Swiss-Prot record:
Practical applications: Calbistrin A has been reported to possess a number of interesting bioactivities including antifungal active against Candida albicans and cytotoxic toward both healthy and leukemic human cells.
Annotated source species: Penicillium decumbens
Pathway: Secondary metabolite biosynthesis
The gene coding this protein: calJ
Induction and repression of expression: Expression is induced in complex medium (Czapek yeast autolysate medium) supporting calbistrin production.
Family recorded in the similarity comment: Belongs to the class-A beta-lactamase family.
Protein name (database record): Acyltransferase calJ
InterPro entries in alphabetical order: Beta-lactam-related, Beta-lactam/transpept-like, Diverse_Enzym_Activities
Length: 418
């Protein structure tokens, strides 16, 4: 038993779980044969790539009648939805429907004459006109100036002002995220609703088709997946909903309690930034395509651009990215501050992370339910870690993610890749 296996067994024990259930998968594009100890199970050919690492541990809920976790459980992947939406928007660029660096106002008139929120004084919002049009690149890199109320003080204060005024919050994407910017597009970085708006662009460029249906026709079916497909509004899909892994929340004392509702559950609309439900197989098929020699979803040059640093070194954008390290630290691992950047679709690790044996060149992100995905295009390998637990990046999950990576990379290096 490896150190990670021992830690995983301890953390997912039914009696005193720190994380009630975990799925870890890694795939590559090689067709290589792993050393006997590389995976618990035999090497299996997946829809794309080879599954070279697979561990499933723990239970499907924290309730007394919980069953051992199965790898075909349905997961609410939260902000890991953003990668799928990023790919969808990049497909629009590959098709010539929109350019990466042209203003998106021709598709999103809501972005015409955007204003920048510079202060909130009592109930008064201090606003000034924005001079820079928002582009698809801005949306894909979180440099648009758009945020979430929980990621920026001024947006939080604005939400409080609206709440005191009796403004009822909407769940429609175009109303929920109709908010001012907090900096001039392209001059900073802020985690926010950029990909939710990207989903609206994808829908409008295809005649108003729902984002869910676009994903079915242009992502899931293209990868060879079959029904039931990943979906939004999972309550409307009873056969899929019945397989959802139970959620949990870790108390300040470290105990786990059931969690039935997530903030990203949206019964009224399809958020490109969150809200997707899928299986591990579904998501890993996307990751495998990004490391494939013959990708089905995007042009190779477009995939290469995803892995290109989009923020200037030492720029305000990089400093703002570092200022929100809790949003991505569980994804990146203990990386040096001068080695972090952002690509098209995720945080980009520009150097090795020796503490966990992680090589440079990793693109990744995650989701509030403690989903973590990463792709190393140069080494043609990708990984996926899943549980259904809040809060994101809590110490128990972060330790498991780092230990998983270290276990995988140590074993990956023993393979003959010739």
């Amino acid at each position: 038993m490896s150190d990670f296996d021992a830690l995983l067994a301890n953390y997912t024990s039914k009696e005193t779980p720190k994380v009630h259930g975990v799925i870890c998968k890694c795939v590559d594009r090689h067709g290589i044969c792993p050393t006997p100890h590389l995976a618990k199970r035999d090497l299996r050919l997946t829809l794309l790539g080879n599954e070279i690492y697979s561990k499933v541990a723990g239970y499907d809920s924290v309730l007394p009648g919980a069953s051992p976790l199965r790898e075909d459980v349905v997961l609410k992947v939260a902000s890991a939805t953003k990668l799928i939406t990023s790919i969808a928007l990049l497909q629009c660029i590959d098709k010539g429907l929109i350019d990466l660096d042209e203003p998106v106002t021709k598709v999103l008139p809501e972005f015409d004459q955007k204003q920048i929120l510079t202060d909130v004084s009592g109930s008064d919002l201090v606003l000034e006109p924005s001079k820079t049009p928002i582009t698809a690149r801005h949306l894909l890199t979180h440099t648009s100036g758009l945020g979430y109320p929980f990621t920026h003080r001024l947006l939080r204060l604005r939400a409080e002002v609206r709440n005191r005024a009796g403004v009822s919050p909407s769940l429609r994407v175009t109303e929920r995220y109709e908010m001012p910017l907090v900096f001039e597009p392209g001059t900073g970085w802020l985690y926010g609703c950029s990909l939710d708006w990207a989903g609206v662009i994808v829908s409008r460029l295809h005649g108003g088709i729902s984002l869910e249906q676009y994903f079915v026709e242009n992502i899931w079916q293209r990868l060879g997946l079959s029904e039931p497909f990943p979906c939004f509004n999972i309550a409307r899909h009873p056969e899929y909903n019945a397989r959802v892994m139970g959620g949990a929340i870790q108390t300040p004392e470290g105990r786990l309690q059931p969690k039935d509702h997530w903030a990203f559950d949206n019964p009224e609309d399809q958020d490109g930034g969150s809200g997707l439900s899928c299986t591990t197989k579904d998501y890993v098929a996307v990751l495998a395509d990004l490391v494939s020699d013959s990708p089905k979803l995007l042009k190779p040059a477009t995939i290469a651009e995803m892995f290109t640093p989009q923020l200037e070194a030492k720029s305000p954008g990089v400093q703002m990215l570092l200022g929100l390290r809790p949003a991505w630290d569980t994804v990146s691992g203990p990386i040096a501050e001068n080695a972090i950047n952002h690509g098209l679709g995720g945080v980009l690790c520009m150097d090795d992370v020796p503490e966990i044996d992680q090589p440079k060149g990793m693109l990744g992100w995650g989701g509030a339910s403690n989903i973590v995905w990463w792709v190393n295009r140069e080494l043609r390998v990708a990984g996926f870690f899943a549980t259904q637990q809040a809060p994101f990046g809590n110490p128990s999950v972060t330790r498991l993610v780092n230990a998983w990576k270290k276990d995988f990379w140590a074993q990956f290096k023993t393979i003959d890749h010739a």
